[in-house]
Every structure is written in structure tokens, then in C-alpha cells.
């Protein structure tokens, strides 16, 4: 679709509604395919058919370096492909020693080159950090290299701290231009018009599927107005999950990309042989969230036996509030948790974060999740 002026209409209409309710947004984010993209492996609840995908945080641990984290992410994708997961996404984070996916498009290429069928994408690119034209070039190039396998999730959060924003040359008003920037990316990925003077080569015509990522009502309204799939970051910001999904579905306007609402829900799932073992593994993630509030983000830490000795009551309340939508336990517990979440949200797809310290143990968690959900080959 070439740019024919409709973007200006969409932008004006979107702003009229979005400016009425625009809380601050911050997400790491997440997410999937279009309605024409068939799902052959599903979680079955009474009324829903839900695909499973993975958000890989590309964690650098106390026992691995950045190269190890990147290779581990690729290895997760290889196994996920065999186990029936729909897609794997990585996210843009800057100046974080424990996350190695800052150059998100490069990491996507690394993962896609090691796999054959699983979709690979950004969950997401923090678009105000970049020129839309450059993002279109990057993801259009990925789409030429890996046809039919690339997703582009877009968010407007910084993905870093205020000091690093200055190094990124991000301006204070950049987030305000997010709706227009999304339209620009979409236009550059569309087939170029005959009189179009600026073309994103080789991206023009690739029409890489776009996703709107969010953790508030703002993203839900924008995704609905533009007719794009919506991924909610409930794996760390669960409070507005249900209201945001309701807003998105009620206001959705069909588009050339999508003819019906499509929702992805982020969820932390850690599976092990027993509930007790899964809870022990989950302490790695609990410590990571605690460290966010302490301002001491660092490398991923190995699990501990007594999490109560690590955090204060206030820190526990803060961390567990962010982790409220987590499913931790044995395969039976995981099955029940997934079934309940799907029934409550009607999610078309779940984006699974399994933040386990040891690589082999994390693979086992993903395998148990796939088996419990009934998607494993």
C-alpha cells in the first residue's frame, strides 16, 4: 500500500481520541501473525484457540557473556521451532548489562539465520529512538532475507534511562510523534508509488506485519484506530490488561493488514517438575524486578532458596505487583494457569517469558510449557 493521504486522516482521527486519554506508557513488550496466518498448534480452552510464542530477554548471566546470551537466544528459537511455538521476539533495551538485545534487528537476523520456519521479530522496537525510514530499511532487509517470517512490534517507551536517551539523541517530544511515525514505517514498507521520490530500498513492498505494543490504554486505542494487532505487556505491567483489551476490541477498525481484532498477552511462565522447584527457579526473576526498584540492574542472578531474605516487604509488594500475571509451577499448574488466562482474556496468542537462569533448565521450562499446553510435536 503506497502512501495516498489516508495516513493524515488516520493521524488526525487518532489524535482526537488519544489525546483524551494518554497516560504514560512504558513497556518491554511483545508479539504475531495476521488473521490470514493459520494457527495449526493451539492451546484449547472452552471457547478459544490460542497460539504460544516466546519473548526472549537475551539475558546475560553471571555465568555467561553477551555472546553466550545471543547464542542461547538462537538455541531457544531452534528448540521452540521444534516444539510448536509460533514466533520468538526480542526487545530493544539500552545500557542494561544484563540484556544483550540492544541492536534488535541484528539479533533478529542472528536468530532467523539459525531457524527455518518460526517467525522472528521485535517485541519491540522503541520507535521514538529511531528514524522511521531507517527502521523500515532494516526490517525490510530482514524480510528480503527471511521472507514471510519477520514481525515488527512498535512501542514508544524509551527502553532505557534518561541519561542514555541523550546518547540516543532522542528528543523529549519524540514520543508525541509515535502515531505519525508508525504510519511512516507502514508507508515505507508498502509498495512504492510511481511518483514516490523517497523509497526505502529494499524494504518497499515487503509489507512487514506491524504490531502495536503497550501497557496502557493509549496503545490499545492507537492499535484499534490503525487496525493493527495489539500486544499487551502484562508480563510486567498487568494492571490495565483487561480494560486495554476491551478498549481495543470495541474500537477496532478493519484495515488492509487486519480484518478483525487480534490480541497478544504477555505472561511470565516458569515450569518445572514440581511447584516447589518452579518457585525456586522464579527467584531469579523476582530478584531482577527487585533490583529495578533498587536502581541496581545488573547481570541475571542464579536462583536462591529463600527469596524472603533478599527483599523487604515493600520490595516484595512492588515486584509481585508487576509479576501478578505469572504462572509458576508443575505442568499441571501451568496448564491450569494458561487455561484460566485464556478464558479470562480471550487472547489470540500468549507471548511467554520464561526468565530462568540456567540455559538448559530454561529450555526444559519451555518444553514443559509446550507439552502442558498441548502444542508440542
Language-model regions, residue ranges each:
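N-terminal beta1-alpha1-beta2 module of alpha/beta enzyme domains
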Residues: 36-118
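An alpha-helical appendage that flanks or caps ligand/catalytic pockets
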Residues: 48, 172-200, 240-348, 374-377
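Short, well-ordered coil/turn segments that N-cap beta-strands
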Residues: 48-50, 85-87, 115-120, 146-150, ...
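Flexible, glycine-rich active-site loops centered on histidine and acidic residues
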Residues: 50-66, 128-190, 230, 238
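Conserved, mostly hydrophobic/aromatic
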Residues: 52, 111, 142, 223, ...
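Hydrophobic faces of well-ordered beta-strands that scaffold small-molecule active sites
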Residues: 52-56, 88-90, 120-122, 150-154, ...
Amino acid at each position: 500500500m503506497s502512501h495516498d493521504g489516508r495516513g493524515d486522516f488516520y493521524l488526525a482521527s487518532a489524535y482526537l481520541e488519544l489525546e483524551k486519554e494518554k497516560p504514560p506508557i512504558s513497556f518491554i513488550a511483545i508479539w504475531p501473525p495476521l488473521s490470514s496466518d493459520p494457527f495449526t498448534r493451539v492451546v484449547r480452552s472452552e471457547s478459544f484457540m490460542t497460539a504460544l510464542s516466546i519473548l526472549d530477554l537475551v539475558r546475560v548471566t553471571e555465568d555467561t557473556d553477551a555472546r553466550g546470551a545471543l547464542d542461547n537466544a538462537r538455541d531457544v528459537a531452534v528448540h521452540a521451532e521444534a516444539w510448536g511455538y509460533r514466533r520468538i521476539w526480542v526487545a530493544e533495551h539500552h545500557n542494561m548489562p544484563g540484556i544483550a538485545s540492544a541492536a534488535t534487528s541484528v539479533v533478529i537476523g542472528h536468530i532467523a539465520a539459525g531457524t527455518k520456519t518460526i517467525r522472528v521479530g521485535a517485541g519491540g522496537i522503541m520507535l521514538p529512538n529511531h528514524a522511521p525510514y531507517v527502521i523500515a530499511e532494516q526490517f525490510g532487509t530482514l524480510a528480503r532475507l527471511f521472507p514471510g517470517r519477520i514481525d515488527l512490534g512498535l512501542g514508544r517507551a524509551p527502553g532505557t534511562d534518561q541519561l542514555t536517551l541523550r546518547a540516543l539523541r532522542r528528543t523529549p517530544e519524540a514520543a508525541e510523534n509515535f502515531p505519525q511515525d508508525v504510519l511512516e514505517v507502514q508507508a515505507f514498507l508498502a509498495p512504492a508509488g510511481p511518483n514516490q521520490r523517497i523509497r526505502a530500498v529494499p524494504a518497499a513492498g515487503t509489507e512487514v506485519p506491524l504490531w502495536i505494543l503497550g501497557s496502557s490504554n493509549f496503545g490499545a486505542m492507537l492499535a484499534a484506530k490503525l487496525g493493527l494487532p495489539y500486544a499487551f505487556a502484562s508480563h510486567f505491567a498487568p494492571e490495565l490488561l483487561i480494560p486495554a483489551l476491551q478498549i481495543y476490541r470495541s474500537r477496532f477498525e478493519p484495515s488492509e493488514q487486519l480484518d478483525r481484532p487480534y490480541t497478544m498477552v504477555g505472561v511470565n511462565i516458569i515450569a518445572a517438575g514440581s511447584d516447589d522447584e518452579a518457585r525456586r527457579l522464579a527467584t531469579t526473576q523476582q530478584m531482577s524486578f527487585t533490583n529495578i526498584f533498587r536502581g541496581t540492574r545488573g547481570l541475571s542472578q542464579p536462583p536462591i532458596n529463600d527469596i524472603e531474605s533478599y527483599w523487604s516487604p515493600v520490595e516484595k509488594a512492588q515486584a509481585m505487583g508487576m509479576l501478578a500475571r505469572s504462572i509458576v509451577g508443575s505442568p499441571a499448574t501451568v496448564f491450569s494457569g494458561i487455561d484460566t488466562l485464556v478464558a479470562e482474556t480471550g487472547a489470540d496468542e500468549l507471548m511467554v517469558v520464561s526468565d530462568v537462569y540456567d540455559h538448559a533448565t530454561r529450555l526444559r521450562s519451555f518444553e514443559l510449557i509446550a507439552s502442558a499446553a498441548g502444542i508440542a510435536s
